Amino acid sequence: MKRRDFLKKSLLGAAALTVVPRHVLGGPGHTAPSDQLTKGIIGVGGMGRGHYGYAGTRLVAICDVDRNHLDAGLQLAGEKIAAYHDYRDLINDPNVDIVHIATPPHWHGIMSADAARAGKD
């Protein structure tokens, strides 16, 4: 390789790094998207809304059988996220890495087992 070609390619590579937004690469004050867990919350009544803002996670889906809770949960999210009435649809969503279950206690067992079978943490 000629020195001129080497310098051109080196400069192009260095310039490309300055074009990439900071939030994509991570670093101080920024988490790269690949280092962030995406989560879904099943049950977005009073308890479920407390699960919205955990560090290192990004909310991508919510689920509730009560339409009023679901609508309020979507408003609280403040961004476009998936909304489901059936928890099985949420746990089968390929965009969801982890699931928070904030339903009445008698539902936790079956939902946890189904989430584990679907490969969700």
What is each of the regions a protein language model found here?
Residues 1-121:
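N-terminal glycine-/serine-/threonine-rich beta1-alpha1-beta2 phosphate-ribose binding loop
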